[in-house]
Amino acid sequence: MNPNYLDFEQPIADLEAKIEELRMVGNDTDINITDEISRLKKKSISLTESIFSDLKSWDIARLARHPRRPYTQDYIDLIFEDFDELHGDRRYADDLSIIGGTARLDNTPVMIIGHQKGREVRDKVKRNFGMPRPEGYRKALRLMEMAERFKMPILTFIDTPGAYPGIGAEERGQSEAIAFNLAVMSRLKTPIISTVIGEGGSGGALAIGVCDQLNMLQYSTYAVISPEGCASILWKSAEYAAQAAEAMGVTADRLKELGVADHVIDEPLGGAHRNPEKMAETLKTSLAQGVAELSRLPLDELVSRRYERLTRYDGGR
């Protein structure tokens, strides 16, 4: 099976393989098969629309983790100008699973902070598979406080299976780093927009996700635990991950219904990885609109609304 396709996409993969075979035949002979290729392309689009119109929560959870899905660095390259990466937490180290720095969204200076996974094995290890350690969250906090000082909107990109659970991370205060971020972000006097671009895993995601506006890409997820983790606890087996994903309500549409997400941003047909440029263009429009709207609010009102938003997560208790 083509690794760029998930199992529920197998009929699409088979059809695309047939189209590619016909292209090769056309290149090697004088036979004109343009009409047949065009017919199969239309059939592929129709089939993709049919499959993606009825995705289950578990299908979406796997799409959110797709290895070709655009990461934070990809969106930085496609959306922003003059990105200047900033490093280190000024206490311990530079955690490369969190990237951040100043940039321009059109002509507006912004601070960008996001989780970063790796593509190849060596890069995955360097980025710690997108699982930040305490120094990553402290780096993020340093950049957020800098953004407040220079009156720059903060744009965060969430894409992590969760905070790193290693012994060293715990010894250096993983839970304290996350909790401190939540407290400080709740009162920062600058607009904050967070976008879940892949998987939003537990406190590791929330540590850069306290915001004035939460966007979720159409095939992203946000949850307190992975479906496999939930299934292992409740059903004693990760084999029940599909049932867990459905019960947890991890998808963008479900979270918008609950009032957790503000906007669900449509992805290109087949997911963001099928057309990263189009996805970036759509996301850029949403971010620019959000920054413009939030920047018009008085800062005290902005912070007050953010706090009210947080209290709604637990029913206002």
Swiss-Prot record:
Cited Pfam families: ACCA
A GO term for molecular function: carboxyl- or carbamoyltransferase activity
Any one of the GO BP annotations: fatty acid biosynthetic process
Record bears the keyword Transferase: yes
Residues annotated as domain CoA carboxyltransferase C-terminal: 39-293
InterPro entries documented for this protein: Acetyl_CoA_COase_a_su, ClpP/crotonase-like_dom_sf, COA_CT_C
Principal cellular location given in the protein's record: cytoplasm
EC number: 2.1.3.15
Highest taxon of the lineage: Bacteria
Keywords carried by this UniProt record: ATP-binding, Cytoplasm, Fatty acid biosynthesis, Fatty acid metabolism, Lipid biosynthesis, Lipid metabolism, Nucleotide-binding, Transferase
GO cellular component, one term: acetyl-CoA carboxylase complex
Catalytic reaction list: N(6)-carboxybiotinyl-L-lysyl-[protein] + acetyl-CoA = N(6)-biotinyl-L-lysyl-[protein] + malonyl-CoA
Protein localization: Cytoplasm
Metabolic or biological pathway: Lipid metabolism; malonyl-CoA biosynthesis; malonyl-CoA from acetyl-CoA: step 1/1
Key word NADP present: no
Similarity comment: family membership: Belongs to the AccA family.
Job of this protein: Component of the acetyl coenzyme A carboxylase (ACC) complex. First, biotin carboxylase catalyzes the carboxylation of biotin on its carrier protein (BCCP) and then the CO(2) group is transferred by the carboxyltransferase to acetyl-CoA to form malonyl-CoA.
Complexes and interactors: Acetyl-CoA carboxylase is a heterohexamer composed of biotin carboxyl carrier protein (AccB), biotin carboxylase (AccC) and two subunits each of ACCase subunit alpha (AccA) and ACCase subunit beta (AccD).
PANTHER family named in the record: ACETYL-COENZYME A CARBOXYLASE CARBOXYL TRANSFERASE SUBUNIT ALPHA (PTHR42853), ACETYL-COENZYME A CARBOXYLASE CARBOXYL TRANSFERASE SUBUNIT ALPHA, CHLOROPLASTIC (PTHR42853:SF3)
Protein name: Acetyl-coenzyme A carboxylase carboxyl transferase subunit alpha
Source organism: Marinobacter nauticus (strain ATCC 700491 / DSM 11845 / VT8) (Marinobacter aquaeolei)
Primary gene name: accA
